[in-house]
Amino acid sequence: MLKTNSTYCTLRWGYPIVDFGRGSIRTCCRTFEERVEPEEFEEKGSDIFLNSDYQIKNRLAHLKGYKNKLNSCTTCWRLEDGKIESPRLPEWLPYPYSFKDSDKNMVKEFTDKELTEVTIVNYVTNEELKLKDITLESDILRSQNPFMLEILLSTHCDLKCSYCSPQFSTKWAEEALKFGDVDKGYMDWSKPHIDSEEFEDSFWLWFDDIAIHSLDRIGMVGGEPMIQPNLFSFLDRMMESYNRLDTKKKPILWFVTNLNASEKIIDRFYEYLPKLCEVFQVEVHASIESFGKKAEYIRFGLNWDRFVRNANKLCSYEDKKNFHFGFQIANNSMSITGLLDFIKVAKDLQDTYKRGITLKHNIVTIPEFHSPMILTKDFAKYLDEVVDYLEKLPVNRMLPVPDPLGTWESFLEWITNIRDSIKNQEGEKIDWVSGDVNNIRASFYEWFKKYDERREVNFLEVFPEYKEFYNSCKELCEVKNGII
């Protein structure tokens, strides 16, 4: 179901992401990070993790429909403009609030005048509140009930994925520094502005007092979580909290990993799983969206054979009740033609180990030239093949997975949505930040030309089926730069 034209999203209230490496916090993976400054940290203490001044102001903008003040949310609206399902969650308010039943349709298809008349109900106290009367001091703008938390211990990473950046990968940062894309000032800027030990102490205070009681999901992301030196000590501390506080909950703990780690590291994680599975429902989501040499090009530094070996190792884990394995699929402008072969790998893992394999779907929107929405309609045929393969399985007879958004049925619906949008050239109608779609395509050529030169690879050798598109982008780039 495509989203409505409201600006509301409950993720702003319930989905904090804490970056210990930079001392920053944000809500939702698609928003900008907010560096914690000493003055506000001293004032708010552990309340900084969900109720900073920045977050309070953004929540007010979400409720009031101030789209022009929500710059970090534009990727979702652009997806929706392109007829693609976005991650935005406009359907419900944070506990204990709800839109009044008689106003719910108005919220979905509002006009500015109507929006001010919407009534919100506190269903614990039955107190009613007009949306127009909400101010920065209103309780509804505060959050004490996060439902999902992501942790970045650091951006330490062993890959330079094409659509990543120096912000999330130390390998990327090293390359950017080498070629002058960033300077030493950027590297200094990326360091925490507050004492790291105080930040971590404050986090655990917030986690034990607030977050642990409402969290349903906790994600370890990166960087690359498997190679963080303090991964296991952090997990030990988290398990200690759950055991000590006896919350009676068994939340999901998931890891988003490139699965490129050494056999020694994967073996250690494998041996640690029984301990984790006593406290959590554990999920490992391997980040991948293509196959073989294409996957190695997109995720520069990846060893495909090692990736497959590690996937088989984890799938062999016998506890199918408390441990689940799957893939985090970031559909992008290069993944389309290798997707079918990758899906067949996932199917083989299910058949070999008789366990459900999760297919979590996502889409790259930044940088814009990595979005599949810039592709010409002839690329839809590759997704026709994926859709045909999935429909013939059929997907509703695949082994079950714990996440409704990770089922093969959900993935089929998602990839059909992308296929149709490419086929209908919805990308040409999107209000791109960098200009019209041809400007983005020109940047595609410019960027991958530089990518090939720096990393000593060859785009067209790996993706010969892109030749016509690539040359078209080259011509657009030359026109843009006044060469022709």
Residue ranges of each PLM-predicted region?
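Short amphipathic alpha-helix with an adjacent loop that forms part of the alpha/beta core around
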Residues: 203-210, 271
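Alpha-helical packing segments of well-folded alpha/beta enzyme cores
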Residues: 149, 203-206, 234, 307-310, ...
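Core AdoMet radical
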Residues: 146-156, 167-199, 213-229, 241-267, ...
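Distinct, well-ordered alpha-helical segments
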Residues: 232-236, 264-274, 338-340
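Radical SAM enzyme [4Fe-4S]-AdoMet core and its adjacent flexible, acidic
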Residues: 1-44, 48-50, 54-55, 68, ...
